[in-house]
């Protein structure tokens, strides 16, 4: 994907080498190495510069990204996409349940990556798939994908630093009590399986989930959940640990009476735009299969 990013150098940034300035903006060392290999990728006031050269307050720095390769082994497939937002740097998708993020052995042609490969192929744009918040196949809702190497690196760092704020909605069995709280229960891989996780206070990694009851209906609760950590299956295990498992969860509560997938939805997401710094906020409504469980 091609992108020209422009920066106005401030007094505080006066005297920095270009590579120092870009590292402060969140570009990785690998990003800088790739940009160096691109022809005339750094311009200052319209003149070609090298990464080691210094900047002066008032300079206009342009970073010209030109990616010509596409993700290998991701065949383009025409699959509808619910696009919530798109600009030159990111695309935000409301992913349906049942769609994997990446192709895999049994899901080679039905992933989000396949759909986006097709979407950009139609526009004659090379596309490398860089998903910044990965959802389980049967979890619906918001996910953000970067469109070039710089936004990808910056968003990845923001995610690691817990600067991407997410709210999930879940439908669980029973009336949740207390109605709000924080679950601090470390998680580890369950012995004998590569998929399942479990609460393990001795060997597990720190996992913290904040929850709040929204409504209760028909013997089920709709719960809002926010994560401080992003462990595999964290919400699913923590709610089961609390005594209120997600309905339809084939791994941790295999009761398919009301739903045939875990009732979990990535509902809301907020973060600073990786390039402009503008605060971004997105919401995806509760999907019908979850809403129907709560109807009288």
Regions found by a protein language model. Name each.
Residues 50-54, 224, 261:
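Short, surface-exposed secondary-structure edge patches
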Residues 91, 168, 221-223, 265-267:
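Short beta-strand micro-motifs in enzyme catalytic cores
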Residues 1-182, 186-188, 289-293:
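RNA pseudouridine synthases
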Residues 176, 217-221:
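Catalytic strand-loop-helix junctions within cyclic-nucleotide turnover domains
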Residues 99-102, 195-196, 221:
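Short small-residue beta-strand/loop micro-motif enriched in glycine and branched aliphatics
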Residues 181-186, 197-198, 209, 223-225, ...:
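Beta-strand scaffold of nucleotide-dependent catalytic cores
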Residues 1-36, 81, 201-208, 215-218, ...:
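Pseudouridine synthases involved in rRNA/tRNA modification
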Residues 194-202:
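Short aromatic-glycine motifs in intrinsically disordered, low-complexity regions
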């Amino acid at each position: 994907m091609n992108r020209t990013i422009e920066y106005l150098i401030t007094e505080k940034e006066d005297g920095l080498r270009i590579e120092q300035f870009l590292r402060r903006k969140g570009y990785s060392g690998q990003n800088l190495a790739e940009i160096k290999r691109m022809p005339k990728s750094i311009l200052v006031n319209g003149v070609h510069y090298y990464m080691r050269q210094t900047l002066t307050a008032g300079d206009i720095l342009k970073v010209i990204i030109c990616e010509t390769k596409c993700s290998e082994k991701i065949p383009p497939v025409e699959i509808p996409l619910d696009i919530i937002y798109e600009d030159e740097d990111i695309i935000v998708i409301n992913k349906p349940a049942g769609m994997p993020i990446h192709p895999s052995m049994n899901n080679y042609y039905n992933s989000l990556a396949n759909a986006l490969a097709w979407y950009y192929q139609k526009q004659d744009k090379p596309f490398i798939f860089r998903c910044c918040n990965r959802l389980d196949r049967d979890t619906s809702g918001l996910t953000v994908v970067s469109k070039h190497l710089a936004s990808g690196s910056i968003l990845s760092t923001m995610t690691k630093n817990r600067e991407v704020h997410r709210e999930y909605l879940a439908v669980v069995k029973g009336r949740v009590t207390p109605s709000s709280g924080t679950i601090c229960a470390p998680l580890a891989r369950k012995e004998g399986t590569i998929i399942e996780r479990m609460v393990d206070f001795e060997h597990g990694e720190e996992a913290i989930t904040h929850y709040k009851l929204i409504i209760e209906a028909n013997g089920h609760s709709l719960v809002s959940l926010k994560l401080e950590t992003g462990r595999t299956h964290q919400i699913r295990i923590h709610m089961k640990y609390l005594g209120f498992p997600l309905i339809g969860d084939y791994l941790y509560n295999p009761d398919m009476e009301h739903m045939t997938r875990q009732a979990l939805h990535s509902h809301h997401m907020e973060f600073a735009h990786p390039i402009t710094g503008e605060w971004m906020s997105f919401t995806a409504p509760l999907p019908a299969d979850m809403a129907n469980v709560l109807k009288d």
